[in-house]
Amino acid sequence: MKINITENIKISMRGYTIINVNAYWEENGRRYAVKACDGLKIDSNDKEVILRGSYDGRNVEWKLCNKGNYITAELTIQSKNEVYIDALCAFRGEIKPEEANQKFLKVPFDNDDWVKFESKEYSKSEMGYGVSAVYNQNGALIIGALEYDIWKTGIIPNECIEVRSGVTDKLTRDTIKHGMVHGEIVKSPVIYIGESRTWQQGMMGFADIYNEYNTRLLWHGPIPFGWNSWYAYMKEIDMDKYMEASKFVSKTNFYDKNVSYINFDAFWNVGLTSEELLKAAEFVKERGQIPGAYIAPFAGWIKEDCIDDYVTYDTGERVRVDGF
């Protein structure tokens, strides 16, 4: 893998060449390209290329590091005063495959709503989330974010492929724009651009590097086995159906270390009274199972006029999230 800075930054990989590589950030609804910064300087060696410049009191640094069979890219905006950044793109470039017929592997943001991985012709593809792949018979290009603690990142397969941090849409389960990230220093996630013989091998390689950047959350309990009401009953769940499921599971080997979960999915708060919920939970416990319900801080179906019945309080004040 080579990074050539004499031709407006070109990256050569297995089966692919990426030309006109650039980066940008968005602020107050406007886009600013790194290469358009004032006083732009380029420092380079065999291992990395660093572009530094400034714009309107902001110091801008864009770093590309050659790691052998993959490259990392990172964009940093720094100012004496806080900056408010809408989005960052630490990698954008025009892909030139040695062979045509390249495809794009779209990776979904999550597994909700029966969403699937999709592989289509590059020109007919849509944004992937977190990590995606461009591939043909000669090789694969894996592009993704190695960090997810601040930004939601999408891989956009346009004429120039770009890795945009600050994406939201219906497939990220958002109905509002990505929030601005602010501070005296605002960084993009570290972006991974790797090559491989196949996209399958490439994804395994990406996972290995991802694990170097992120600590796995270890689970010390038994393997979670259980039953969930949605597939069988959807919104028709009631106490009798739930208890029958508990009986069935108790007669099978669907458990690990004698632990299994019997879970209510959505509509449990409609199909059962409070008394029925308590009775069902006790029924499950008597069989050595653990009862559960589908609810989370960010998955609530609460009517506005009932909000005060559900919110939590801290030191006597109602806890607010994002101003609500």
Question: Where in this protein do the model-derived segments appear?
Answer:
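Carbohydrate-recognition beta-sandwich/jelly-roll modules
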Residues: 1-256, 287-290
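Active-site-adjacent "subsite" loops/lids of carbohydrate-active enzymes
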Residues: 292-324
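The substrate-binding groove and active-site-proximal loops of carbohydrate-active enzymes
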Residues: 223-240, 260-274, 319-324
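Generic recognition of stable, solvent-exposed alpha-helical segments in well-folded globular domains
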Residues: 201, 240-244, 272-279, 294
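Surface-exposed amphipathic alpha-helices with a cationic face
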Residues: 250, 277-292, 296
